[in-house]
Amino acid sequence: MDNKLTKDIRIPVSLCDHTGHLDIPGFFTIFMDMASEHATDINIGMDNLGEKGLIWLAVKSKFRFYSKPKMFSTVTATTWPAEPARIRADRLYKMEQDGQLIAEGKNEWAIFHPESGKLVKFAEVYPADFIHWDEIVCEGRYAKLKDNFDDAEEIGRYTVASGDLDTSRHMNNVEYLKVIFSAFTSLQLEEMNVAEVDITYKNQCYEGEELILKRKISEDGCEIGIIKADGTAGAIAKITLR
């Protein structure tokens, strides 16, 4: 049982922006796909949990970006789980090109039992003989993001479509990032030198829901709230610029 998954990936057109480089949601897409694959390899994937009536629940993410690889160039991406706490666990990620670190990240996960509405202890489903890879990347705490966007600027609206859903029939984690970055014009994106993205998932969003995107400007970037019709936040992101 491999305690990490490493892949050489040729950057596809479908994950690139108009400049011909891997876009920010593209980084997330690669990493989340690898996380799902590796979880399956170590017998804690979506299908494995589904047999027990459980699902993975993304809580929050932090990713740092140092350069964006060009379309059709090759990168080496790696993911591995950190040793879990009682009901929360981090999964770690890094991407390298020509021996240089170009992105690193982590996200916090929980295991959820939808029928009871409770979180499940990792010890109940985690392989007891698993030996963890001990490398640490993306050090530092997750951002503490508040969901008060009452006075924030509205920058767009989005209706959750069928193509945004995951197997649990709520909005896929990566789709939140796609919605956020699609709210900016191509010129704005060119001017944004993104150093770090934090995102906290607050409430699940479902097909047909209209979401309001609100922005609060800060000295080093901005915070984006994805706000549901009832005023609660679906997700909150902090974009830190260089």
For the regions a protein language model found, what residue spans apply to each?
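HotDog/MaoC-like acyl-thioester-processing domains
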Residues: 2-7, 62-66, 70-146, 201, ...
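Short, well-ordered turn and helix-capping elements at secondary-structure junctions
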Residues: 13-15, 67, 162, 198-203
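Exposed loop/turn and edge beta-strand positions of beta-sandwich/beta-sheet ligand-binding modules
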Residues: 59, 89, 195
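A conserved acidic, glycine/proline-rich C-terminal tail/linker
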Residues: 187, 191-215
